[in-house]
From Swiss-Prot:
UniProt GO cellular component terms: plasma membrane
Keywords, alphabetical: Cell membrane, Disulfide bond, G-protein coupled receptor, Glycoprotein, Membrane, Receptor, Transducer, Transmembrane, Transmembrane helix
Gene that encodes the chain: TRHR
Membrane as UniProt keyword: yes
Protein name, entry field: Thyrotropin-releasing hormone receptor
Topology in the lipid bilayer: Multi-pass membrane protein
Location of the protein in the cell: Cell membrane
UniProt main location, coarse: membrane
GO biological process, one term: phospholipase C-activating G protein-coupled receptor signaling pathway
Chain ranges on the Cytoplasmic side, renumbered to this chain: 52-61, 122-144, 216-266, 320-398
Organism expressing this protein natively: Bos taurus (Bovine)
Length: 398
């Protein structure tokens, strides 16, 4: 990603080529192999978990799959070529590889930023505008938004096809080929600055504002309920005999909904914060170098910037596993490590099904499965207010 300037290359150097320290090569190869290897496995697991587990197919998880694919692209296109560059000290993938690999690098980077922005907006609508969420926070709409995100970033990143070329430096003892720019820094620096603004500054400002609104609703005020459900509770006279039971159960699952939404929001906020922190060194370096006559390219600092980028793309599956019970259980099931549940008498599982006004669309929240005891089983169906839509809980004996 630290492409060199064409004006600085394609020239003959009389002095011998600078030798990269052996410890730098070893550290680079080991760190990149470990981080990228674990990140590739983790992100593939995220995609498989959501695709193979029906209850995991929620709008939020749909955006997380898009983020996982983008992170995979960054790890493969940016991380692995760094290993060959450390080993050979020269670009070995040719002209086509220069174009395609650089294109995939920026496509993954920009798509990950857009995916984070998309799920931030989705969380804001779902929590702060629950009525609108019935129509906006749906799985099919999430898929359409993701298609638009990838189409937009794919077209935008085609710009790099016209800026790149192979640059050759002839030294006294070697010929070094690098994937760099065919134009001077005066022309590509504005592109870097535009990239910095559109895919870093704007998403982070937007995320800060929206998560502020979300925190105010979740942690300072009760979650607003659906007015339709409130009116229906007064209209249904036949349910008055179970009013006390329904009230207790509704409160129980309302609290579960609030707790679950807080946990999911915390998890997504951690993803956004780490994205901002881990991308800051590289983004800052690019901006600073855009104003320097001679760019700062100290090897160890460049390695630090690259490792931060790879960590950002590799760490998200770890966050999901640590902060989401549903992801943790799904990961265990995918790895065939799930232990047999211990049978407990008089415990029942709760199957949550949510109906939306559009029957062809299914919308599900991130509420984790919970268990209830016989105290709450006298009523077959219990209604409670979900923050996004009307909901119904059906109890099935496990």
């Amino acid at each position: 990603m630290e492409n060199e300037t064409g004006s600085e290359l394609n020239q003959t150097q009389l002095q011998p080529r600078a030798v990269v320290a052996l410890e730098y090569q070893v550290v680079t190869i080991l760190l990149v192999l470990i981080i990228c290897g674990l990140g590739i496995v983790g992100n593939i697991m995220v995609v498989l978990v959501v695709m193979r587990t029906k209850h995991m197919r929620t709008p939020t998880n749909c955006y997380l799959v898009s983020l996982a694919v983008a992170d995979l692209m960054v790890l493969v296109a940016a991380g692995l070529p760094n290993i060959t560059d450390s080993i050979y000290g020269s670009w070995v993938y040719g002209y086509v590889g220069c174009l395609c690999i650089t294109y995939l690098q920026y496509l993954g980077i920009n798509a990950s930023s857009c995916s984070i922005t998309a799920f931030t907006i989705e969380r804001y609508i779902a929590i702060c505008h629950p009525i609108k969420a019935q129509f906006l926070c749906t799985f099919s709409r999430a898929k359409k938004i993701i298609i638009f995100v990838w189409a937009f970033t794919s077209i935008y990143c085609m710009l790099w096809f016209f800026l790149l070329d192979l640059n050759i430096s002839t030294y006294k003892d070697a010929i070094v080929v690098s994937c760099g720019y065919k134009i001077s820094r005066n022309y590509y620096s504005p592109i870097y600055l535009m990239d910095f603004g559109v895919f870093y500054v704007v998403p982070m400002i937007l995320a800060t504002v929206l998560y502020g609104f979300i925190a105010r609703i979740l942690f300072l005020n009760p979650i607003p309920s659906d007015p339709k459900e409130n009116s229906n509770m007064w209209k249904n006279d036949s349910t008055h005999q179970n009013k006390n039971l329904n009230s207790k159960t509704s409160n129980r699952y309302f609290n579960s909904t609030v707790s679950s939404r807080k946990q999911v929001t915390k998890m997504l906020a951690v993803v956004v914060i780490l994205f901002a922190l881990l991308w800051m060194p590289y983004r800052t370096l690019v901006v600073v170098n855009s104003f320097l006559s001679s760019p700062f390219q100290e090897n160890w600092f460049l390695l630090f910037c690259r490792i931060c980028i790879y960590l950002n793309s590799a760490i998200n599956p770890v966050i999901y596993n640590l902060m989401s019970q549903k992801f943790r259980a799904a990961f265990r099931k995918l790895c065939n490590c799930k232990q047999k549940p211990v049978e407990k008498p008089a415990n029942y599982s709760v199957a949550l099904s949510y109906s939306v006004i559009k029957e062809s669309d299914r919308f599900s929240t991130e509420l984790d499965d919970v268990t209830v005891t016989d105290t709450y089983l006298s009523a077959t169906k219990v209604s409670f207010d979900d923050t996004c839509l009307a909901s119904e809980i059906t109890f099935n004996q496990s």
